[in-house]
């Protein structure tokens, strides 16, 4: 069973980063890392369905959602498995990621291994935007950078 994973984020522009995933205890996955080249502010941060980046980040498909739920925030009961909320970049364009999540997993039905991590252009409205797109994507906009999540030591 995997206890650690890593993802290298790259895109067509300057946004890049490395994200680490580590199982802590039985269910909690600690997500850490750094993303550079972002505009200042919040950016949607999600695990997408497929580990396919052949057409850039768009071929990664929708948010990872094995339970067919509506989009939500990371603390919501009603959320996609892949909904990790937002990362926040400072004036220097760097976002330091620190998320503890008990919905994603590194094995089993909620495993994110082999799926794509995506950082988006806009803030995720956490499903509270009042329109249909909000319940699917959080109105987070285009995909700035992505990478496939793989097992590591």
Swiss-Prot record:
Chain residues carrying a lipid of type S-palmitoyl cysteine: 7
Subcellular location(s) of the protein: Cytoplasm; Nucleus
Record region (Disordered): 56-80
Listed cofactors: Cu cation; Zn(2+)
Chief site of localization: cytoplasm
Residues binding Cu cation: 46, 48, 63, 120
Catalyzed reactions: 2 superoxide + 2 H(+) = H2O2 + O2
Function as written in the Swiss-Prot or TrEMBL entry: Destroys radicals which are normally produced within the cells and which are toxic to biological systems.
Protein name: Superoxide dismutase [Cu-Zn]
UniProt source species: Sus scrofa (Pig)
Gene responsible for this protein: SOD1
């Amino acid at each position: 069973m995997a206890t650690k994973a890593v993802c290298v984020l790259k895109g067509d522009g300057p946004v890049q980063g490395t994200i680490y995933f580590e199982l802590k205890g039985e269910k909690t996955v600690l997500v850490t890392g750094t993303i550079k080249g972002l505009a200042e502010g919040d950016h949607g941060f999600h695990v997408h369905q497929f580990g396919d980046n052949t057409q850039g980040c768009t071929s990664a498909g929708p948010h990872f959602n094995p339970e067919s739920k509506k989009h939500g925030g990371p603390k919501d009961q009603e959320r996609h498995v892949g909904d990790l909320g937002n990362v926040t970049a400072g004036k220097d364009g760097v976002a330091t990621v620190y998320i503890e999540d008990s919905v994603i997993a590194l094995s089993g039905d909620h495993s994110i291994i082999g799926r794509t991590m995506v950082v988006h252009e806009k803030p995720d409205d956490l499903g509270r935007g009042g329109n249909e797109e909000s319940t699917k994507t959080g109105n987070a906009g285009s995909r700035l950078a992505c990478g496939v999540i793989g097992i590591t030591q």
